[in-house]
Regions:
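Glycine-rich phosphate/adenosyl-contacting loop at the front of the ribokinase-like
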Residues: 1-78
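Conserved N-terminal subdomain of the carbohydrate kinase-like
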Residues: 34-55, 69-124
């Protein structure tokens, strides 16, 4: 089967919290989803810089195309990435997953999603 998807190219940055206290410190409610600006993202990631982190390509369409590829289907992804290191990571990760990628590259930053994972597994 040949399938191509068009979607948002987002890199998921997963941070494992030692406890939930840090959420109060940075003013975020546990389990909430908030759209934040670049400055807020940098402040959060700076505050949590010492925590273990994992980076993975994300976005629902990309995740579906990667899953299809892992099941043996020919899949492709169309999206927009920035001309930055995170965009390069995204492109490389899709290639390694066997997903043909077709990107529009801009001078801006690649989109990202910061996910803080509490010890009980809840995502914020």
């Amino acid at each position: 089967m040949n399938t191509i998807g068009l979607g948002n190219a987002l890199v998921d940055v997963l941070l494992r919290l030692e406890n939930d206290d840090v959420l109060s410190e940075i003013g975020i409610q546990k389990g909430a989803m908030d759209m934040i600006n670049r400055e807020q993202m940098i402040a959060i990631r700076t505050t949590l810089a010492g925590l273990p982190r994992t980076q993975t390509p994300g976005g629902s369409v990309c995740n579906t195309m990667r899953s299809m590829s892992s099941l043996g289907a020919n899949s492709g992804f169309i999206g927009k990435i920035g001309d930055d290191s995170i965009g390069g990571f995204y492109e490389d990760a899709l290639e390694k997953a066997g997903v043909s990628s077709y990107f529009i590259k801009t001078d801006g930053l690649t989109g990202s999603c910061t996910v803080m994972i509490s010890p009980d597994g809840e995502r914020t």
